[in-house]
Amino acid sequence: MDKIIIKNARENNLKNVSIEIPKNKLVVMTGVSGSGKSSLAFDTIYAEGQRRYVESLSSYARQFLGSTSKPDVDSIEGLSPSISIDQKTTNKNPRSTVATVTEIYDYLRLLFARVGVPYCPTHHIPIKSQSIEEMTNRVLELEEGTKIMVMSPVVKGEKGTHADTLSKLIKEGYVRVKVDNVIKDLNDEIVLEKNKKHDIYVVVDRLVVKDGIRGRLFSSLETACNLSHGKVIIDKLDGEDIVLSEKYACPYCDYSLDELEPRIFSFNAPYGACSCCKGLGVQYKLDLDLIIPDRNKSINEGGISTINVDESSNIIYTELNAVSKKYDIDLDAKIKDIPKEKLDIILYGSKEKLEFNYVSKNGNTRTNYDYFEGIITNLERRYIETKSSWIREWIEHYMNEIECPVCHGARLNSNVLSVLVGNKNIYQVTELSILELKDFINSLKLSKEQEEISLIIIKEINSRVDFLINVGLDYLTLNRSAGTLSGGESQRIRLATQIGSRLTGVLYVLDEPSIGLHQRDNQRLINSLLEMRDLGNSLIVVEHDTDTMLAADYLVDIGPGAGDNGGRVIACGTPEEVMANKNSLTGKYLTGELKIDIPEKRRRGNKKFLEIKGAKENNLKNVNVKIPLGTFTCVTGVSGSGKSSLINEVLYKALAVSVYGSKVKPGKCKEIKGLENVDKVIQITQSPIGRTPRSNPATYVGVFDDIRDIFANTKEAKIRGYDKGRFSFNVKGGRCEACWGDGVKKIEMHFLPDVYVPCEVCNGTRYNSDTLEIKFKDKNIYEVLNMRVDEAMEFFSNHPKVLNKLQVLHDVGLGYVTLGQIAPTLSGGEAARVKLAKELQKKPTGKSVFILDEPTTGLHTDDIKKLLVILERIVDNGDTVIVIEHNLDVIKVADYIIDLGPEGGNKLGGNIVCTGTPEEVSKVSGSYTGQFLKKILDTK
């Protein structure tokens, strides 16, 4: 069958969608946010393919994977084995790096195990084991006529008179020894100081290098090795000594390594990992400045921040009062005035037992005698022992990541780091970018034997490197943590890995692979997709990028709107056929009938600036730049050019310190002028709004508090005495205790992404049955959380407080998202827009700076148009918007552009290419952004 036939798909908002999708083609699905693209591509087509795969496995295998429900669809025919490459499965495991997820590290481990040369870390000489035959050949390579002594080091750096050793040598018939660099006759009396270290080398033979000595030399070397457990020193009377060893050890200090195996180069295995950080390269330490942010406060005023938010704070205050009484500590005094030795008791615990009198809620008193654990000691213990990801995440707010003091971030132990290939150890190789690795691997100077051994290994590394370069990731360093990659970067890494696997007959479902990619690199990505297609695979790509849509063999436009207004196939066919369809919103944007207009004039700002001088963070090359306040500024450049380093690391962190007194460490720069002109800074990134099911859009923007108030004020709730806390899933009372109000249970898969399964007690509702009996307008709290934002706006139309907060979520294009959608399932773009919605509720100050990192992620051109209206509104209120962006529809409407590059990575990135209005940048021939802008502005 040459097509996938779908009949009556009803998953989520799909309206009985029936469609035939050609196989072995590049198929692009597009439409506004929430129209149903992902519901069709991922929740229907991919989910059914995955379900069928699981069903085909043995019952033994299925017990580990669990059952997957069938998508709501009548039938799907012609389905191939399916693989999903989306943005939501980024591996946050700190042990995952670019090198490990691309499998390049596996081949590097193999390369180092097979051709690596171990060096003694003390004497910096290669460690080699040599047979007597090899030693003989080595000596005979010396210039003819060279006078040598074959010596055996029987004593090396040892204290004592060594009388027994010398006596034994005389009995064995030896005549001369070299004692502390002086040749002595054994027949003479040799007196050595007892408390000094000595070296004693036995002179086994004296020779002149010439033809005919091989037999004698071989015999002498063998004798020398037997005397000193495999070590020989060849003393060239007129030159440096040659040290030879029969063992795999340093001949000077006996430093030795086990046989080189790939496993010892893994930081995920105990054989190679640094024993201090267990292969993480970093340690997490509680930061006292984060625990006590303001030492002018007293403990009773909340000076210790962890006590204020900890559910067990009443217990701790009981214990603190006992500590205060015992050690005469004034809990109302400013923390800075408490003597260090007394504050240490509060922080690190007591050395003697105290009397604690605990009072329960019903008034009962319980007395206990125990040590006071201490605030910091308590947090450290709980961080190690807890199985709750929520508790661990909360404690991490008070921790700092510091470089491991032993391996200094290398993750591996010193033994492993002493093995070199091309004068680099394996950690130094992982510090290279993908492009630099290609140069390094292909310029290695290897012996003929090493070349033969490494030929296939280097071929495999080159293959993976080429695929990564082709998807625009040449700037990434191999040791970059996988958790720091953007959704687009991690997806393109997985895409490169799949291309490298050379599978055929597979259905790939991708989610916006062009995210984070500069227009310059778009064609390379499209070529990679076409290459996968040409291998005999089918590709379904959810995408908004114009170039990708025009390159598609088949285009599917879903809409017309979001949520209930979407879920229909509006147009399908070749890109030309979709453009000819008058009902297609996408088609109208592709033809230019609809477009985002270029403003008639650009704002000049309020004549105030943020001026960054001498920025050197990551790959930034002493960057100097001025950002006009009161404008919409776009920071552009190819991937890896330094945009995030300049804006997120240098500027944002400096503003956070200046405005809020934050404890973060700003990126390296000489100075930043104009900080006094900013009274508020808001950073909107694609990082999750939370990492647990407790976080959702409703709680994040604060509307859930108002909704709980409404439920608490219902007649039935008042009769039962329920307050708003009853409707919280974060505290005991109304929540389901089996899942702690999560509605799901997390199953840690260790080597796979964690899996969330519905709680079998509450069936995913989060609440107990008593709480769910309380209804407002015939809906319980769970049913309200399941409403989409647009539905909830109608439901709460008579509650202005709720409506206003929901309106902002709608305005940023999230009307289709459910109020209770758990944070881990939100895409990076959705998470960013939830954060923006929260900030838009607040009144403008005229001195605020909004920093957004790729806010157009996941947005159709029509959604971008709406987002730009909001950003323009912020700037019109006098505030400043700084956006890191690749999308030309955003760049062309900016007031000011800062273009970095010219390329990505350490060598060619990190410079200011040009600055100015879009018109000014478009005239700079050396700017890739300018070249693409010119095409757009010329057609204005």
Language-model features: where?
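Conserved phosphate-binding elements of NTP-dependent enzyme cores
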Residues: 1-940
